[in-house]
Amino acid sequence: MADFKSKNGMNEVEYNELQNEMDRLANIKWQGYAKTIKEVGVSYLGAVAQSAKLRHSLYHKVSTYGIYLASANLSGFNVCPNSEYCKDNCLNGSGHNRLDRLSKKGSIDRSRIIKTRLFFANREVFMRIMINEIEKKRKKAE
């Protein structure tokens, strides 16, 4: 545990907050999409064409579902294997997220952190939410 804290640059308070959040997420049970996503604390897990990059696929009549997770060790977990080389220039701080950070809201980062932690704390619920969202988008695309 001490290695995890030092590796992620966390103090005792931050580490305890992370543990509490991970416990909360780990104990979430599937109750249907709407109830579960509300309990997780985000509006959605992923979406089709939610960014300028993903909207380009619509020009080719392809719906691309994407999930934005927290970059490098922002969530306490690293989901980017190359972050050591690029975290200083990461696109995580660009676009709408840059505006959100400048306005001091932090809601985009907070949402990405929750999604990333859910992935590690409760993979079953994460996958059920993701599959549910993809199925909804697939039906709409047909």
Where are these regions (language model features)?
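Class I S-adenosyl-L-methionine
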Residues: 1-142
